[in-house]
Amino acid sequence: MRACINNQQIRHHNKCVILELLYRQKRANKSTLARLAQISIPAVSNILQELESEKRVVNIDDESQTRGHSSGTWLIAPEGDWTLCLNVTPTSIECQVANACLSPKGEFEYLQIDAPTPQALLSEIEKCWHRHRKLWPDHTINLALAIHGQVDPVTGVSQTMPQAPWTTPVEVKYLLEEKLGIRVMVDNDCVMLALAEKWQNNSQERDFCVINVDYGIGSSFVINEQIYRGSLYGSGQIGHTIVNPDGVVCDCGRYGCLETVASLSALKKQARVWLKSQPVSTQLDPEKLTTAQLIAAWQSGEPWITSWVDRSANAIGLSLYNFLNILNINQIWLYGRSCAFGENWLNTIIRQTGFNPFDRDEGPSVKATQIGFGQLSRAQQVLGIGYLYVEAQLRQI
């Protein structure tokens, strides 16, 4: 049985809406907030006054406005903690610092690392944090970590990390908080992409999916504007949908998963086997083959890679067709290094998808299924993981 909403709950909801708008807009006046929130300016004034008393927002004078203090600009209180957003693998760390408003500070960085053990990986994260703390000594800087594989966002444990040489869980959150004395939040790298789209793409649908086609293939769903993780935090494992029951064995132990056909790691394995069968004069070293070399070979029209890329796109399209039948999410964004295969690769995916059986000719075209490349920069993508703190704050109001 559902209960009615009392005045306190309505006030809580409205405060969250205004804070969400300020995190998205970064700066806004009352009239803009009233228009976006679809309430009156006096109602917005009352909410802002309460949020200001709680030191969550501040008002600054805007010289371009001429109607007094009430027309000033409002923003999230800048005195709050900053966040160091990291996307972490055993071979690289991408980082972007953000202030209390989740606006980027400093430059986006990509660092190559060598982490053969969990301890080595944690050490690299610590070094990265210490370096940024020295750059911004006047601010408390918390950590937001995006890690590939299965992650428990509540305990902050990396349960499986496919690219890593180890197979044991790593208590990332606990160990870093104990060592650094700061807050640490951890989630999956596909959740990072979903949060980035949710908070930084103002034209985003309430329901959408991001798919990361890279070393592996992962995805994250946003349903009714909320990240769907599942009770065991294993949702979005589209890379382990089976496309060929008699196919190659996958790292998960099953046969013919999408990752064994369509991921970059699968394409590189096929390329290494093929290159080893070629004359010594072949320019590419199969043991040192890089993703950049693989993509360059495709761009130059090498037939051996062209057919594999087409096959991978067909497999992704087939998986998406099944996915559309089940969830009826009509906006899908593709991210990852495989997007460098370009429009032909994307069009093959779309053709294999065919059509969403739930699309109807009489429906509005804006609601038709859309599959495309994500448009956020890499810095914006990594910044997405920082919104874990924003969503945690909104839950606690």
Swiss-Prot record:
InterPro entries assigned: ATPase_NBD, ROK, WH-like_DNA-bd_sf, WH_DNA-bd_sf
Gene Ontology molecular functions: DNA binding
Annotated SUPFAM superfamilies: Actin-like ATPase domain, Winged helix' DNA-binding domain
Pfam families: ROK
CDD domains, per database record: ASKHA_ATPase_ROK_YphH-like
GO biological process, one term: DNA-templated transcription
Stated family: Belongs to the ROK (NagC/XylR) family.
PANTHER family named among the record's database cross-references: BIFUNCTIONAL UDP-N-ACETYLGLUCOSAMINE 2-EPIMERASE_N-ACETYLMANNOSAMINE KINASE, ROK (REPRESSOR, ORF, KINASE) FAMILY
Protein name per its UniProtKB record: Uncharacterized protein YphH
Organism (species): Escherichia coli (strain K12)
Species classification: Bacteria, Pseudomonadati, Pseudomonadota, Gammaproteobacteria, Enterobacterales
GN (gene name): yphH
